Each structure stands twice: as structure tokens, then as C-alpha cells.
Design a protein with these regions (language model features):
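Gly/Ser/Thr-rich phosphate-binding loops and adjoining beta-strand/alpha-helix segments
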Residues: 19-51, 67-84, 138-141, 163, ...
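Acyl activation and transfer enzymes in specialized metabolism, enriched
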Residues: 37-64, 184-205
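Small-residue-rich loop/turn and linker elements
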Residues: 66-99, 127-137, 221-233
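Helical lid/core segments from catalytic subdomains that handle acyl or acyl-like groups
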Residues: 90-149
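Active-site-proximal acidic secondary-structure segment that organizes catalysis
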Residues: 107, 119, 163-219
């Protein structure tokens, strides 16, 4: 983790402007072609959710601005790696949050997600989970597989700058379109003091490219993402 010197930061002016806003959150939504991942998940008997979550988390970790957070002291910090914290629907219909540590080892991540999902789904009480203050080195993630929506809004506690600095990732039901490919809407909401629309566009570009190379990606995610980011000119600067 690295603390950013605001006074020496290129984003000093927009940061100081947007951090004062009552609502500093903005979001962008776009369609993603998930056909290759869907086919692979079907072919291998794997969970589409876990497979897609791995690709999303790996891709977004490559966009430096999406790893920036505001900590409890009001400092801007850059994390080396971000983990997904996603919503689980329990057997009784009540939602719970589930953080899974991230690794670029696909098999290890997949097995951890499946284990965490099953464990959380069986928990009788989640009150403690919702009350616990966690480190902001996560992406808050939610999936609504029942609806092919156009955009998404998320709840925020705007007085808590640290929690509000955590990006929200949302996606809906995938549908087969006229060309035979399955697509879904993916929404990214982020704190405008930390990043602009270009960073989210970069995130969509990396995800889209990884989705096109799904088979190669799951075999060697680092090499595929290295090549994608080199081609797109996406690199860490801080």
C-alpha cells in the first residue's frame, strides 16, 4: 500500500474539487460479450459466476485508478491488489456479503470462491458481517441474474469517505442477442475524486479484450493481460 502525496499528485485539483461533493459518485454502464466465457464454463462444468468474477477482478486490477481508496485518516492510498467482496443470496432469501482474497492463480481462486459461497449461503446470521468495518481494498460486487437491466444505482453512506471510495461493480442477466452471442450489462460506479471516466473506459477495454481471448486468459491470465495492457497503453504511473 502506498500513501499518495495529494500536493504532488497530478489529480490534486479535481480531487480537492470532487472530494467536497455531497455525492461524488458517478457510474458508467456498457454491454459485455460473455459468449466465450459462457461456452467455456459450460464445456468445463464450471460456475459462470466464479469464472466471470475472476476475469473481472483480474482485469480491473490492471487499472491503477481503480486501486485508489480514501482511508479512515482521509489519506488517498494505492493498493497493490484489490479483492472482490460480493453479495450472496442465502438459503432463506436474505443477502450476505462475502470477501474472497484474490490471486491470479485461476484454479486456486475458483475453488476459494466456491467454498466461500457455499459457507456463506448456509450461515444462519449475517448481522455481524454487515456491522464489521472492513479494509477498503475491495470491489463491492453484485449480480442480478434475474434481470437484464440498463443501469444500476447503489446505496452509499456519503459521510463515510472511505466506504464511498470503494467502486461498485454490478451486472445483470446475460441474454442471447440476434448474432447468437450472449451479452450482459455491466455497471461500474466510482468516486470522482479518485478517477475520471477515462479510467472506467480503460476497465471496459481490458475486460472486453480478455473476454475475446477467454480460453487463453484462463490458461495464462498474467501474460494475456500484460499483452492487452501493452496494446492499450495502460500502465501504472503512481
Amino acid at each position: 500500500m502506498k500513501i499518495i502525496d495529494i500536493e504532488a499528485w497530478d489529480r490534486k485539483t479535481p480531487y480537492k474539487n470532487f472530494v467536497r461533493y455531497t455525492n461524488p459518485i458517478f457510474s458508467l454502464a456498457a454491454r459485455l460479450d460473455v459468449e466465450a466465457v459462457y461456452r467455456r464454463s459450460k464445456r468445463t462444468g464450471r460456475s459462470f459466476f466464479a469464472d466471470f468474477l475472476f476475469l473481472v477482478t483480474a482485469s480491473l486490477n490492471r487499472v491503477e485508478s481503480l486501486r485508489l481508496r480514501i482511508n479512515e485518516k482521509g489519506e488517498v492510498v494505492l493498493y497493490e491488489q484489490i479483492a472482490p467482496s460480493f453479495i450472496v443470496m442465502q438459503e432463506n432469501g436474505v443477502i450476505a456479503t462475502c470477501r474472497t482474497e484474490f490471486t491470479l492463480n485461476y484454479e486456486a481462486f475458483y475453488q476459494t470462491v466456491r467454498r466461500d459461497l457455499e459457507k456463506k449461503a448456509r450461515m444462519e446470521s449475517v448481522q455481524e458481517e454487515f456491522n464489521r468495518k472492513e479494509e477498503p481494498d475491495v470491489f463491492y460486487t453484485t449480480c442480478l441474474p434475474w434481470l437484464d437491466f440498463v443501469s444500476m444505482s447503489n446505496p452509499y453512506h456519503y459521510e463515510d469517505a472511505s466506504a464511498s471510495s470503494i467502486p461498485r461493480l454490478s451486472w445483470g442477466k446475460f441474454v442471447k442477442e440476434s448474432d447468437g452471442h450472449r451479452r450482459l450489462t455491466f455497471d461500474i460506479a466510482a468516486h470522482h475524486a479518485l478517477l475520471d471516466g477515462k479510467a472506467i473506459c480503460d476497465a471496459f477495454a481490458v475486460m472486453s479484450a480478455a473476454l475475446e481471448e477467454a480460453d487463453a486468459f484462463y490458461e495464462d491470465p498474467k501474460s494475456v493481460l500484460d499483452a492487452i495492457c501493452h496494446k492499450l497503453g495502460i500502465q501504472d504511473k503512481l
